[in-house]
Amino acid sequence: MREYDSSSPARPCLGAIWAQTDAGIIGRDGTMPWRAPEDLAHFKTVTVGKPVIMGRRTWESFPPRFRPLPERTNIVISRSITGDSATPFERDGAFWVPSLDAALTLAGDMPLAPNATRHPDSPHQRVTAWIIGGGSVYAEALSREDLPSFGRVEIIERTFFYCQEGNEITGDTYAPELAVEEFVTAGEPARWRILGESAWEKSERGYLLDASGGKNPMYYSFQTLARL
């Protein structure tokens, strides 16, 4: 098993970050079925100063006043880009590219912003670009080990949410299933291990939206995973 070494020399390192319910839901009808201010603050702290890579639908899910995400280079993948527009171009404060490979090639060539190093003793410092959604982008990135500039995703940062039993939180988009060392069954190969996780806390201002639109008290925990 490889141990995390915070003194390792800098090199391109790709991370993926998302929030999910304990049932794996990450979205519903093109948005997220929760309000989670603590997760938004955590997301900004982890990703600020680094390129963030997303699909077009993820980009469009952000309110216009929040696009592009500040203090980060925004790279948007749009499969409809063809022909003369196949090379990266800027629009609405973001770089637009036709594929995940093009996004990673662009991100791999970018220097980190001065405000990027905020976790000198954590694996977050290793990450030089983050994938932030949506489901198909996560799935492609996590299934490959030949990603341009990076090879593969090395770090995953995920936030878990749960609410009281009996309140159903529904969705139509799910987080990737991960073979985590601490939870695989006997004989199943593990791909990830837990580097750290926070204690469960109740959100002061956040909530989960159930199937009828009701607001339910929300509990959350942050978890960091690394490749084995």
Segments (PLM) and residue ranges:
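Enzymes that bind and transform nitrogen-containing heteroaromatic metabolites
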Residues: 2-228
